[in-house]
A protein has these predicted regions:
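Conserved AMP-binding/adenylate-forming core of the ANL superfamily
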Residues: 54, 72-127, 144, 148-149, ...
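AMP-binding/adenylate-forming catalytic core of the ANL superfamily
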Residues: 139-165, 179, 323, 330, ...
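Gly/Ser/Thr-rich phosphate-binding loop
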Residues: 300, 328-332, 341-408, 422
Length: 630
């Protein structure tokens, strides 16, 4: 069956489609049906089933005789460490950790915050929570104390599992003082903290509250898997809301496993035992879904990489990883490839490695500009697949389903909506628009299994954020269009569609033009306030390493390119060359913050920012164009 047939089968009978997919999961009690719609528009899936995520991700592979298969490859260029963990070893380690947590009083429904770097123990902590039916909330290691405190107060965890430190290129990030500061600030106090001591820094433990990761496991009975209901929250993952309180996305246990398991073969086209590498972080949704859960649910080998695409030690790190670990599928953010391309524009380092194991490259997290996709296609000679999803959804809304059928790639499009997703482009009034017309991207309810059923302790906010604007739909917050072949194009966040003298224009389309310039490594376009036209586009350009060009000349060339390719209507005349762009740690460019700086508006320092100093550089650059007036 090709894509059209599979999609049609889902449309004809979604209930049968998802019940069939649910057969791939071990259930203690099979669900009586897939969709539970008695509380619409709040839908739930597999509610009356009973199952356990850790059993499905670890124990069942051991039971099936695959205990010797590698579950986790740990490769840490920042600490010069490598080791592997088999499924059998993982089962022993997770059961022991879960037993120790249980002895300290952790049980089904309790929340546990995990504050860890990219080490296998982070996955073990997640799985140990799942084993007990506890609800984990992973917070990106090294996150500021205030932000951690806000999450402690929202999730009210009984315990926090943390590492003593994280390692960034050239520096040690001290986690324990951040954790202590967060607990001091938080109104809610955890009963205890488990500290994984790394040899790079041994943290001081607070007597009575903190226990050592290894010591508290001594002599403890290992824990068995606790069955939970299909709609039991597997985890809470906070996505930084643009204002105020972070939003706690809830992930339901049953649908999460069914959907992720389905994607491994159908989208990524892997088999059990294949090596799958999502080069992300466990603190983000990609790390939850595709470092921890999906590869292990499917019986693959997952990769925990503690390093960066460049600088650990060079722009060849990804290629070394692929050769050394025989990686079949690589999934990363376009930002990572832009960083590699900036350091090694001609891709000369690729030739030093044997990449024959690589079957495909998947990109998500930021719009993948055509220039980056073409560069990767040319060098890697494998399908380069952009796909689109959100923290809220947990897996792809639109993709090229390589395991069903490799569809023609249209550069600039994450291809087509996956079974389960009825994607519609709507105008302001909520009416579907014809192909080729820019509008708000929405998904007709119900959303498929594994997506967020609500926000943690914030149902009213869930409805307001996602359901109220377009009744009967989930509002994605992205803007784009669908072409006549059904391919989706994501042009910008709805906030990044700018209005220039009454014309609605996508900043993403302008970024594509800028990125295509041979000397430009990376770029961003924002809309700044203009008395005459309402808004004007303004571009930021980062140059390739070794590009010895006059900045003003390059600015002149990109201004001309936008005029030629989008037209004078874009009114694109403002651009400035900068050393780097402000980003979140997951690689998303902070366009909204740059807009506020340009307009001289008040802004809150984004919690997820990688390096706050960059905002000062952006302000200085904007002042040369007469913006960011204070």
């Amino acid at each position: 069956m090709g894509y059209k047939e599979v999609h049609a089968a889902w449309q004809a009978d979604p209930e049968a489609f998802w019940m069939d997919a649910a057969d791939a999961i071990d259930w203690d009690t099979k669900p009586s049906k897939a969709l539970f719609d008695d509380n619409a528009p709040l839908y739930e899936w597999f509610v009356d089933g009973k199952t356990n995520t850790c059993w499905n991700a670890v124990d069942r592979h051991v039971e099936a005789g695959h205990g010797d298969r590698t579950a986790i490859i740990y490769d840490s260029p920042v600490t010069h460490t490598k080791h592997t963990i088999t499924y059998g070893e993982l089962q022993t380690r997770v059961a022991s950790l879960a037993g120790a947590l249980r002895t300290k009083g952790i049980e089904k429904g309790d929340r546990v915050i995990i504050y860890m770097p990219m080490v296998p123990e982070a996955l073990e902590a997640m799985l140990a929570c799942a084993r007990l039916g506890a609800i984990h909330s992973v917070v990106f290691g090294g996150f500021a104390a205030h932000e951690l405190a806000v999450r402690i107060d929202d999730a009210t965890p009984k315990a926090i599992i943390a590492a003593s430190c994280g390692i960034e290129p050239g520096r040690v990030v001290h986690y324990k003082p951040l954790l202590d500061g967060a607990i001091d600030q938080a109104a809610h106090k955890p009963d205890f903290c488990v500290i994984f001591q790394r040899e790079q820094e041994v943290a001081h433990l607070d007597k009575g509250r903190d226990v050592d990761w290894h010591a508290f496991q001594y002599g403890v009975e290992p824990a068995d898997c606790v069955p939970v209901a299909g709609n039991h929250p597997a985890y809470i993952l906070y996505t930084s809301g643009t204002t105020g309180q972070p939003k706690g996305v809830v992930r339901p246990t049953g649908g999460h496993m069914v959907a992720l398991h389905w994607t491994m073969k159908n989208i990524y086209n892997v088999e059990p035992g294949d090596v799958y590498w999502a080069a992300s972080d466990v603190g983000w949704v990609v790390g939850h879904s595709y470092i921890c859960y999906a590869p292990l649910l499917y019986g693959c080998t997952t990769v925990v990489f503690e390093g960066k695409p460049v600088g650990t030690p060079d722009a060849g790190t990804f290629w070394r990883m692929i050769e050394e670990h025989k990686i079949k599928v690589l999934f990363t953010a376009p930002t990572a490839f832009r960083a590699i391309k900036r350091e090694d524009p001609k891709g000369e380092l690729v030739g030093n490695y044997d990449l024959s194991s690589l079957q495909s490259l998947f990109l998500a997290g930021e719009r993948a500009d055509p220039d980056t996709i073409e560069w990767a296609q040319r060098l890697l000679k494998v399908p380069v697949i952009d796909h689109w999803w959100q923290t809220e959804t947990g897996y792809a809304i639109a993709a090229n389903p390589l395991g069903i059928e490799e569809l023609p790639v249209k550069i600039g499009s994450p291809s087509v909506s996956m079974p389960g997703w009825d994607v519609q482009i709507l105008d302001e009034a909520g009416h579907p628009v014809p192909p080729g017309t820019l509008g708000a991207i929405a998904v007709k309810l119900p959303l498929p299994p594994g997506t967020l059923p609500t926000l943690w302790n914030a149902e009213a906010r869930f409805r307001k954020s996602y359901l109220d604007h377009f009744p009967g739909y989930y509002e994605t917050g992205d803007a784009g269009y669908v072409d006549e072949d059904g391919y989706l194009y994501i042009m910008a966040r709805t906030d990044d569609v700018i209005n220039v003298a009454g014309h609605r224009l996508s900043t993403g389309a302008m970024e594509e033009v800028l990125a295509a310039h041979p000397d430009v490594a990376e770029c961003a376009v924002i809309g700044v306030t203009d008395q005459l036209k309402g808004q004007l586009p303004l571009g930021f350009l980062c140059m390739n390493a070794g590009a010895d060009r006059d900045a003003q000349e390059v600015v002149g060339e990109v201004v001309k390119s936008v005029r030629d390719q989008i037209g004078p209507v874009a009114a694109f005349k403002l651009a400035v060359v900068v050393d780097r762009l402000p980003k979140t740690r997951s690689g998303k460019i902070l366009r909204g913050t740059m807009v506020k700086i340009a307009d001289g508006a008040e802004f809150k320092m984004p919690a997820t920012i990688d390096d706050p100093v960059i905002l000062d550089e952006i302000r200085d650059a904007l002042q040369t164009l007469g913006y960011a007036r204070t």
